[in-house]
Amino acid sequence: MNLNRRVMGSTGTSSDDPPRGLSFSAVPGDQLHTPGAKLVPWIRAAIVASLLVMLFGAFVRASLSGDGCGTSWPFCNGGSLLPDTSVLKSVIEFTHRATSGLLLLFLAGLYVASRRVFPARHDVRAGLLLAVVACIVSALIGMILVRFGWVVLDRSVGRAITMPIHLVNNLVLLAGLVWAQHRAAGGAVSKWKGQGPLGQAFTMSVISVFLLCMTGALSAMGKTAFSVEKAMTNSLTERIQMHIGEGAHWILRGGALHPLLATSFGIMLVLCVNLMMTRRPEAGVKKWGQYTIGIFLVQMAFGLVNLIASAPWFMQLGHLLLALLNWMALIMTGVYALRVTASDSAVVEPVEADVAPAPRPVYAGIISDYIALTKPRVISLLLFTTLLAMFIAQQGMPPLGLILAVMVGGYMAAGAANTFNMVVERDLDVAMERTC
């Protein structure tokens, strides 16, 4: 593709066409004339089907049906082709396996169809192939969970490691489908590398969502593995004590990080998305950026209600659905924010200078910028007063590990707060037209 001309879609659709409605496509449905236009509704159907299969998988876990087929896989209870219909959890587990298999066949069929329409190395083919591979990996993870008995009330380390990986893999599957649908509909080409602050903001957003979803998966596992103990609690205070009190299981302690990290990572996500909307104030970026922030705020409120209500299965599914929708909105925000424009490929003539400035080393620049943002002199004063209070409370020297944790963690927290404050103040200045 010649990037020195205006970037066009698959049939010449301008990448500057604004998105409309709630569709993931770059142009309205009645204007789709790309070679892959016939694939677009099928890819959208695959997105919906994937969401349903993922939600049903969460229902399998929440309903304690993961052992419905015993340790047999892919068949049920020792090789039976069909489950015992008199046992509800066997029907639930087998239905999830069957629908997952049908989804894999559907995705594989879409990939084969895309090979007939799009040339090699096209984004649609790459996105669908990524979805197929992720679906296969998801099936293998399911096999591991069943074969090792890491289901229902199991509290093993293996399950605690596998469940977060399972959810992140599902996010990758959805990302591949969303990207393939966008490009099949004539959406603009996007480039992650070499995008400066835009690429860095999108990278930080993706990492934040990954980490948040991983702790969320651990929290959901704890709700299942300790469902008997949770049912014996009578109040929110008892449930909180069960998670963070003395003698609390490490899985529950890890799950308790989820609502705490949701706040910090949520701030990071909002700031990064806002940066993308500010740096590239175009219709597509604003639309999907607003969706990303809006869905996340709804998800936060929903999660709080979920916590107070002791996380019934239907609210767990609702919380997961919001997380998946938020992820897809973030992907679309990045797609539009990182799109390749004509100016990106413009040839810049070199300007001769008498003395070329010496380039500043990359790491030296990062360290210098970090110090400027975090204001270490101010933080040092705060840490000194904190450390003094620790010595007074201990009536002597506190444990070395505690000192290191407070000093390092305090510096990072205060530095991040300073950075956020400067970014917010800058955005306020721009909004109030006090600066250029």
Task: Label the model's feature ranges.
Residues 214-265, 270, 274-277:
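Membrane-interfacial catalytic/cofactor-binding modules of polytopic membrane enzymes
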Residues 56, 60, 96, 414-436:
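Acidic (Asp/Glu-rich) catalytic motifs at the cytosolic membrane interface
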Residues 102-109, 168-184, 264-271, 324-339:
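Hydrophobic cores of alpha-helical transmembrane segments in multi-pass inner/ER membrane proteins
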Residues 38-65, 208-219:
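N-terminal signal-anchor transmembrane alpha helix
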Residues 45-48, 287-288, 294, 384-386, ...:
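Membrane-embedded alpha-helical segments that form the functional core of polytopic membrane enzymes
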Residues 60-71, 140-164, 219-230, 301-324:
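Interfacial helix-loop-helix junctions of multi-pass membrane proteins
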Residues 84-106, 248-263:
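Individual transmembrane alpha-helix segments
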Residues 62-94, 225-251:
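Extracytosolic (periplasmic/ER-lumenal) interhelical loops and adjacent juxtamembrane/interface segments
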